[in-house]
Design a protein with these regions (language model features):
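Structured alpha/beta or helical-core interaction and ligand-binding surfaces enriched in interleaved
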Residues: 1-108
Length: 108
């Protein structure tokens, strides 16, 4: 699943029984997510991977991360929140493009 949040952009996938990879293109995004959720996880960097940075965690950690995302929801407009968040503002135009592309499905 892809998650775009005020902490960063992530891809979460299941890799084997009970294990998940929380992946990011930018290390700081994982650092933000770990700090916000209070989980303990080692960030691994795999230079040859599609998503360079990741943590490998139990499903229960992903559940805690998802709860943190819900509990820290403090905005009524995602794009504006990204613009106002220094560690994420450089992603604003990209998120705008994603919004526009997905809007075209709604309009079709």
């Amino acid at each position: 699943m892809w998650i775009a949040s005020k902490f960063g952009f992530f891809s979460i996938v299941r890799k084997g029984e009970g294990k998940c990879h929380v992946r990011a293109r930018i290390r700081e995004d994982l650092e933000n997510l770990i700090a916000a959720s209070g989980v303990e996880a080692e960030i691994l960097t795999w230079d040859e991977s599609d998503y360079r940075h990741r943590v490998i965690v139990k499903e229960s950690v992903v559940e805690k991360v998802m709860a943190t995302l819900a509990e820290t929801l403090d905005y009524d407009n995602f794009k504006n929140k990204i613009i106002d968040t220094p560690s994420q503002s450089d992603k604003a135009s990209t998120y705008g493009e994603i919004w526009s592309m997905m809007y075209s499905y709604q309009s079709a």
